[in-house]
Amino acid sequence: MNFLKTKTYENLKKAFVSECSARTRYEFVEYGQRMQGLEGLATITDKIAYQEFNHARMLYTMLCQKVKDNPMNNVDICFDIPFRQRWDILDNLQFTAKDEEEEAKFYQNASKVALEEGFKDVSELFENIRQVEIKHKKIFEFLYNGYKNGTLYKSDTKKSYVCPSCGYEMVGTEPEKVCPLCQAKMETFTVLLPKNLAF
């Protein structure tokens, strides 16, 4: 079977471009969060953007391995890419969760197609990325709900909150609104994700 004539080849190309695009969109979102002093949110968004970069890298590597006997100079790719993000924090958290949900659906279908076409390795790659995208969706939903409801920095149990600026440690169900040592705002503190969503 000529790999260049398969749906799996088309899906690999789309997935690569989609992950590159997601990384850049999330970096825009992260930039907006940092500009508004929301370092805790920005740190998590930055980690997810970096993971999207690595998804693109893995897809690119797989694509190169599959076409090594048919070197490519240019790859034609035509499909829709989400273009929802704006400069509103809540909207962007909601949009990124939606993006991740759509990615997970794409990977589920692409994995099935790759397996049907006999590319088990590509199918497994798609499925592994799908699992991460599902987690990303849950993280963005958690951040959205916490930011919207004002519970992002609150916990039912006592936790240790360390100021990222000066290292001052507070123990409680939420950090002080302002660090008593350096006066950094609570929004700069690391957002504590639930254990099932932690990196």
Name the predicted role of every residue range.
Residues M1-F199:
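Non-heme di-metal
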